[in-house]
From Swiss-Prot:
Residues that hold [4Fe-4S] cluster according to the record: 336, 396, 399
Protein name: 3-isopropylmalate dehydratase large subunit
Subunit details: Heterodimer of LeuC and LeuD.
Catalytic reactions on record: (2R,3S)-3-isopropylmalate = (2S)-2-isopropylmalate
PROSITE patterns named among the record's database cross-references: ACONITASE_1, ACONITASE_2
Gene for this chain: leuC
Organism lineage string: Bacteria, Bacillati, Bacillota, Bacilli, Bacillales
Organism: Staphylococcus carnosus (strain TM300)
Length: 460
């Protein structure tokens, strides 16, 4: 019987353990940041253990860094975490992409940009959106602080092999519909737990035609579907992205191995979901979970059709209303889901020549310094700033209420991030997950509009 892509990579990395039981996996790449690593480093000190593979461990500063002034860290806890990471990396000889360097950024953007993320690898990080790296045909997953310490000490991790779920996505995306809409639609249709216990392989003609940026957007939100892992078969698009990166180190042996990374024709998946995207609409979440979303033309559901009726109360919305009825106050373009260069370029098309609505505070946070520099070289920053957007420094920013960038209580925010839980963007904040295009257009109009009809709306 053939093997799935996931099984091939998994089996190659098993050090010990029986099928059906926890197995010890070798870890090829460990990415760390300032929030989940301090206790793990301290654990090494207490046990008087060395860091086993500093050469396979890479760090960046992202969660707590201020995006207005990266060196003026007013929050004492944030300042302590950042300084602690800097000291730990120096002590344990870990490469740190530090504040102010050209390589700093959100961890799930730095890995791919530096060529560290590659097909066939096992990749871990103390962050739940590590599945992002699966877009390259890798097994990538988030871990907790105790597991971070285990990888520090052993370069391995005990894991139970999941089942395999194929999401077969086909058809040409309509104009104005994006990768973000695909993953939001899947979560809306099947819920936030349909991927629990599975590794999700995203395949089909649609996936093959997506860029690496778009593939990363989809894999990034596998965790919102309940899955620990999400991955895509590597191909020429993958190779073109990786080949000239600083840490790519493309050897003939590595390239030959990559050619084997696909699911065999006779591979057996435990479950298959099929999606035709030809009629897909822009998606908008209305509630307090990523599954609480609708297509743009669809009214919000009746109370009896949702899992938590308190969501309407928290969000200040009612059944039967539509996305265009929401009174927005903030727009956030950023996060490890949608802060790559192509996201900002696409969003700028809806902004150029227009002004941010008077009721809107609009913020753009490039996901990395590399993206920021590239965007500025193209004049993208000027388009946003001329329109009235704030153009910030790289970081996780308004994706989570951990740093100074927060949405005021009771205010609705169109956000390109990945989670819309209560308080995710600040106490009382009301988050609506959308594509960069939808967020950008909303900043101009002051409300959500159907970006498929952008020209008609803006010229009306």
């Amino acid at each position: 019987m053939g093997q799935t892509l996931f099984d091939k990579i998994w089996n190659r990395h098993v050090l010990t353990g029986k099928e059906g039981e926890p197995q010890l996996l070798y870890i090829d790449l460990h990415l760390i940041h300032e929030v989940t690593s301090p206790q793990a480093f301290e654990g090494l000190r207490i046990q008087k253990r060395p860091l086993r593979r500093p050469d396979l461990t890479f760090a960046t500063i992202d969660h707590n860094v201020p995006t207005e002034d990266i060196f003026n860290i007013r929050d004492e806890i944030a300042a302590t975490q950042i300084k602690t990471l800097q000291n730990n990396c120096a002590e344990f000889d870990v490469k740190l992409f530090d504040n102010g360097t050209d390589q700093q950024g959100i961890v799930h953007m730095v890995g791919p940009e530096m060529g560290l993320t590659q097909p066939g690898k096992t990749i871990v990080c103390g962050d739940s959106h590590t599945a992002t790296h699966g877009a390259f045909g890798a097994i990538a997953f988030g871990i907790g602080t105790s597991e971070v310490e285990h990888v520090f000490a052993t370069q391995s991790l005990w894991q139970t092999k999941p089942k395999n779920l194929l999401i077969d996505i086909n058809g040409k995306l309509p104009q104005g519909v994006y990768a973000k809409d695909i993953i939001l639609h899947l979560i809306n249709q099947y819920g936030v737990d349909f991927g629990t216990g599975y590794a999700l392989e995203f395949g089909g003609s649609t996936m093959r035609n997506l860029s690496m940026d778009e593939r990363m957007t989809i894999c990034n939100m596998a965790i919102e579907a309940g899955a620990k892992y999400g991955l895509v078969q590597p191909d020429e698009t993958t190779l073109e992205y990786v080949k000239d990166r600083p840490y790519a180190d493309l050897t003939p042996e590595k390239l030959e191995y990559w050619k084997t990374l696909y699911s065999d024709e006779d591979a057996q998946f435990d479950c298959v979901i099929e999606l035709d995207v030809t009629q897909l609409e822009p998606q908008v979440t209305w509630g307090t979970s990523p599954e609480m979303g609708v297509s743009f033309s669809t009214p919000f559901p009746a109370i009896e059709n949702i899992n938590d009726e308190r969501a309407y109360q928290y969000m200040g919305l009612k059944p039967g209303e539509k996305a265009e009825d929401i009174e927005l106050g903030y727009v956030f373009l950023g996060s490890c889901t949608n802060a790559r260069l192509s996201d900002l370029v696409e969003a700028s098309k809806f902004v150029k020549g227009h002004q941010v609505h008077p009721n809107i505070t609009a913020i753009v946070v490039p996901g990395s310094r590399s993206v920021k520099h590239q965007a500025e070289a193209l004049g993208i920053d000027k388009i946003f700033k001329d329109a009235g957007f704030q153009w910030r420094e790289p970081g996780c920013s308004m994706c989570l209420g951990m740093n100074p960038d927060q949405v005021p209580a009771g205010v609705h925010c169109a956000s390109t991030s990945n989670r819309n839980f209560e308080g995710r963007q600040g106490k009382g904040a009301r988050t609506h997950l959308v594509s960069p295009a939808m967020a950008a257009a909303a900043a101009i109009e002051g409300r959500f509009i159907d970006v498929r009809n952008w020209e008609a709306v803006i010229n009306a």
